[in-house]
């Protein structure tokens, strides 16, 4: 772990947890959760994707300064990273590097062929012929075999290599180019940095052979890869717990973690990590503490919980507005929710029932599990529209400033549960 600037540090392979804050007032609650339950886990308080910044009209500097100021005011004296999330272009990298971020998450999803998993052999070979000239390195992997400590065997057959090349080849090249650009920018500035690669935004899980080719190619090219976010089995939807077979996920996590140890070590990163309590212990146990978890939207939902408890009228206005925006704003998210997942606010007179339908109540959730109500997703994906609305955005911010203690406490309670689940998994791994 080394200093990168006056504020942000690189965190290495220590377990870490990213706290995204889309409003700029959540860090005191994040700090309190870390103080209560974060022992041995390193925080990343400034974390935001380029998409989130655009939707909330905030700059990289705004996000960084709000988090660092909140951190200091809350009495945090330990280290923090600074995650410039989902970077797609050199411009994205330049503006976040200049602001002082230390952790750069590369998102090459625009260069992934989402349909590759469904191609028959003929189509696969046709598509490969289109990219073959760009993938001069792929031939090195044909025929390679690897046995993991879990007993799983990885074989880079011709078909596996062709499919990986078509699906991820251009994405790998783009990621390497962007990582080299970041290295040059940070090198000229004399700042340390670390790279995360995100390949999780696909419909189908990342196979072990694909994980191997992606990571090995990046490491061979000298990329400072500190963490990788594969697409795991099951569904990792925004705002709710893991949806899928936990036994299948446990086996898959064990294999991916073993591969990360063997090649790196580098951390396995869990994106859309908010509220995935049912699988946090598995992640911590499988990785032996070498993990990173990203959260963001859940802190916005806890801001709405403050509205639910202190200004019912505002909460109802936000629900109605979010329902109007839902079909448009959901376009860039993988969600199961529909407008039928929760009744309109006008049909619910009881304030507690309204909070239950749209946010969930921890007192009703079994220990070791997270929220599952899909009403949360209606509010989750419409954050940008609410926060930039000329009426609702300022009203919500004013309310949070007036009730900062409530916001801090509901956030601390929320994240303590998540950190405790990770700690439990680490304890069984040790």
Language-model segments: residues:
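The substrate-binding groove and active-site-proximal loops of carbohydrate-active enzymes
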Residues: 80-84, 161-169, 243
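Residues at beta-strand starts and edge strands
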Residues: 78, 191-193
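Active-site-proximal, glycine-rich beta->alpha crossover segments in alpha/beta enzymes
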Residues: 115-172
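Short glycine-rich or small-residue beta-strand-to-loop segments that form or flank ligand, phosphate
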Residues: 194-201
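Conserved, mostly hydrophobic/aromatic
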Residues: 85, 197, 271
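Active-site capping/gating regions of soluble enzymes
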Residues: 1-66, 70-74, 90-112, 117-119, ...
């Amino acid at each position: 772990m080394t200093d990168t600037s006056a504020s942000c540090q690189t965190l290495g392979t220590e377990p870490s947890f990213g706290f995204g804050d889309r409003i700029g007032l959540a860090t005191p609650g994040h700090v309190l959760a870390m103080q209560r339950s974060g022992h041995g886990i390193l925080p990343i308080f400034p974390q935001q994707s380029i998409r989130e910044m655009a939707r909330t009209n905030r700059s990289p500097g705004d996000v960084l300064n709000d988090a660092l100021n909140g951190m200091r005011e809350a009495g945090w004296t330990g280290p923090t990273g600074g995650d410039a999330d989902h970077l797609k272009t050199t411009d994205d990298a330049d503006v976040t590097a200049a602001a002082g971020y230390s952790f750069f998450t590369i998102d090459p999803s625009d260069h992934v062929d989402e349909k590759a998993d469904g191609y028959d052999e003929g189509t696969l070979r046709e598509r490969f012929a289109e990219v073959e000239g760009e993938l001069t390195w792929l031939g090195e992997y044909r025929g390679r075999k690897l046995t993991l400590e879990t007993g799983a065997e990885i074989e880079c057959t011709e078909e596996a290599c062709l499919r990986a090349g078509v699906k991820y080849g251009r994405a790998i090249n783009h990621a390497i180019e962007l990582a080299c650009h970041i290295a040059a920018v940070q090198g000229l500035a004399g700042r340390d940095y670390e790279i995360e690669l995100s390949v999780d935004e696909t419909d189908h899980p990342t196979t072990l052979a694909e994980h191997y080719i992606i990571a090995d190619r990046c490491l061979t090219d000298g990329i400072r890869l500190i963490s990788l976010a594969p697409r795991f089995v099951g569904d990792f939807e925004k705002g709710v717990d893991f949806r899928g077979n936990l036994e299948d996920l446990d086996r898959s996590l064990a294999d991916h973690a073993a591969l990360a140890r063997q090649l790196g070590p580098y951390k396995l990163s869990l994106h859309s990590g908010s509220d995935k309590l049912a699988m946090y212990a598995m992640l911590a146990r499988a990785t032996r503490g070498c993990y990173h978890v990203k959260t963001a939207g859940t802190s916005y939902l806890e801001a709405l919980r403050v509205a639910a408890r202190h200004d019912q009228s505002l909460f109802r206005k936000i629900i109605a507005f979010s329902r109007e925006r839902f079909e448009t704003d959901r376009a860039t998210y993988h969600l199961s929710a529909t407008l039928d997942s929760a009744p309109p606010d006008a049909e619910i007179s009881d304030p507690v029932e309204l909070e239950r339908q749209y946010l969930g109540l921890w007192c009703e959730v079994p220990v070791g599990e997270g929220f599952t109500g899909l009403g949360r997703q209606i509010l989750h994906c419409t954050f940008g529209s609410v926060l930039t609305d000329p009426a609702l955005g300022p009203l919500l911010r004013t309310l949070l400033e007036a009730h900062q203690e409530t916001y801090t406490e509901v956030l601390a309670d929320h994240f303590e549960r998540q950190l405790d689940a990770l700690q439990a998994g680490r304890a069984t791994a040790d």
